[in-house]
């Protein structure tokens, strides 16, 4: 098939999904001799815009995995604002060294329902949003090499097609999609961190406003960054993006869950690709 434009489309709180999607899309665009376009829908304003694709396009679309699934706050955008129009797609998910569970198959199914035809898919490891040690430094050089190889193989598959496939690419995951992963304490009791919000050390804060500008939910008050006026999805864009390290979480359940993840899933996880 002749593809004229390859899109890199992504939500990325801390930058790992952006790095991965842009790398794969750039590799595919080069291999397919196609134009490269980029759309970042991380901010609330960006999620107001509809994106329409066509039969001569291909979208590498990526999101992070939250609790083993596509983040539920992204579902309205993914299901209503994207229109595939027969374009090919490569769904990509980033997971923080635990597991991508049903995140990839859920994203594949969403894109199929949006009018795309997924022809390849990948689940890649990125440093966990909660942690600086879990999946530390990933994607690293080896991961980038795997992304490049995946991009080449996916492009070769597309080039060999005479028409769009009748069925989307088979990927790992269960149908029906399983519930969101629930963290538990040492006694097996569920830990609910849905309403947990970050704190701000105002003695450290320099008032730059980056946290408010980068919050994907627009929940941090730019006039007083210590105030989180909307929902927090624990993407940690504010924590990891603060140059003064003034943002932090101190909720006991959150910290227990973070510590447990770092202990149980310390062994580096592998990327998985599907063609």
Language-model features, listed with the residues they occupy:
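Iron-sulfur cluster-binding cysteine motifs and their immediate structural context
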Residues: 200-201, 206-233, 237-255
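FMN-binding flavodoxin-like domain, especially the glycine-rich phosphate-binding loop
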Residues: 1-19, 23-43, 49-191, 250-275
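Acidic, Ser/Thr-rich low-complexity intrinsically disordered segments
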Residues: 176-217
């Amino acid at each position: 098939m002749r593809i004229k434009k390859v899109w890199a489309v992504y939500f990325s709180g801390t930058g790992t999904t952006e790095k991965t999607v842009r790398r794969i899309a750039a590799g595919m665009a080069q291999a397919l001799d196609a134009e490269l376009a980029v759309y970042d829908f991380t901010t609330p304003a960006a999620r107001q815009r509809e994106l329409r694709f066509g039969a001569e396009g291909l979208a590498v679309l990526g999101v992070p995995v939250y609790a083993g699934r596509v983040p539920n706050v992204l579902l309205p955008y993914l299901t209503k604002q994207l229109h595939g129009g027969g374009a090919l797609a490569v769904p990509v998910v980033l997971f923080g060294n635990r597991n991508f569970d049903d995140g990839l198959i859920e994203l594949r199914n969403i894109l199929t329902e949006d009018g795309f035809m997924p022809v390849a898919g990948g689940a890649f490891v990125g440093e966990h949003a909660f942690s600086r040690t879990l999946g530390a430094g990933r994607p690293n050089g080896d991961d980038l090499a795997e992304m490049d190889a995946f991009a080449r193989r996916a492009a070769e598959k597309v080039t060999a097609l005479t028409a769009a496939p009748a069925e989307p690419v088979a990927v790992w995951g269960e149908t029906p999609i399983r519930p969101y992963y629930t963290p538990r304490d040492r006694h097996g009791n569920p830990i609910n961190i849905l309403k947990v919000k970050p704190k701000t050390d105002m003695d450290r804060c320099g008032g730059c406003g980056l946290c408010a500008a980068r919050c994907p939910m627009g929940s941090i008050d730019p006039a007083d960054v210590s105030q989180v006026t909307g929902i927090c999805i624990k993407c940690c864009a504010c924590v990891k993006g603060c140059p003064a390290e003034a943002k932090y979480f101190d909720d006991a359940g959150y910290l227990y869950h973070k510590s447990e993840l770092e202990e149980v899933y310390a062994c580096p996880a592998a990327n998985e690709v599907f063609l």
